[in-house]
From Swiss-Prot:
Tissue specificity: Expressed in hemocytes (at protein level).
Protein name: Ctenidin-1
UniProt similarity note: Belongs to the glycine-rich peptide family.
Its job: Antimicrobial protein with bacteriostatic activity against the Gram-negative bacterium E.coli, and very weak activity against the Gram-positive bacterium S.aureus. Lacks activity against the yeast C.albicans.
Subcellular location field: Secreted
Main localisation: secreted
Secreted as UniProt keyword: yes
Example GO biological process: defense response to Gram-positive bacterium
Source species: Cupiennius salei (American wandering spider)
Keywords per UniProt: Amidation, Antibiotic, Antimicrobial, Immunity, Innate immunity, Secreted, Signal
Modification Glycine amide, positions: 138
Other noteworthy facts: The peptide Ctenidin-2 corresponds to the shorter peptide indicated as conflict in the feature table.
């Protein structure tokens, strides 16, 4: 059992590096909360398709896991009010926060974690997080 721990740690680091580079998924939150279905694969969250100022749910899937929350000031049909919410899963897991003009924080947890969100756009976490989950206008 002890010899498995270093292997798990090394694999986590490698995957986190690839995730931060956007491997298998978008790094950008996108516009004012809209734009594309981000995420997927190892790269994790980002994107969102709800439109509006705070809007939409983040992408996700694969090992990156998770769906970002988000409120949607204009289009909130698929969301959980202004406070956001959402849920995750997979190795990257975590919850996406956000919502409203203030955005908030994306999820995290799992082996990599990290924070998305912030600014107008919100965003997701994903496996290994990533530096580009937030930003004033939903991601850079």
């Amino acid at each position: 059992m002890k010899h498995l721990i270093p292997l798990i740690v090394m694999a986590s680091v490698v995957l986190a590096v690839y995730a931060d580079r956007g491997y298998g998924g978008g790094r950008r939150g996108g516009g004012y909360g809209g734009g594309g279905y981000g995420g997927g694969g190892y790269g994790g969250g980002g994107g969102g398709y709800g439109g509006g100022v705070g809007g939409g749910r983040g992408g996700g899937g694969g090992l990156g896991g998770g769906r970002g929350g988000g409120g949607g000031v204009i289009d909130g049909k698929d969301d959980v009010g202004l406070g956001g919410g959402g849920y995750g899963g997979g190795l990257g897991g975590g919850q996406g926060g956000g919502g409203g003009l203030g955005g908030g924080q994306g999820g995290g947890g799992g082996l990599g974690g990290g924070r998305g969100g912030g600014g107008y756009g919100g965003g997701g976490g994903g496996y290994g997080g990533g530096k580009y989950g937030g930003g004033k206008y939903g991601g850079k």
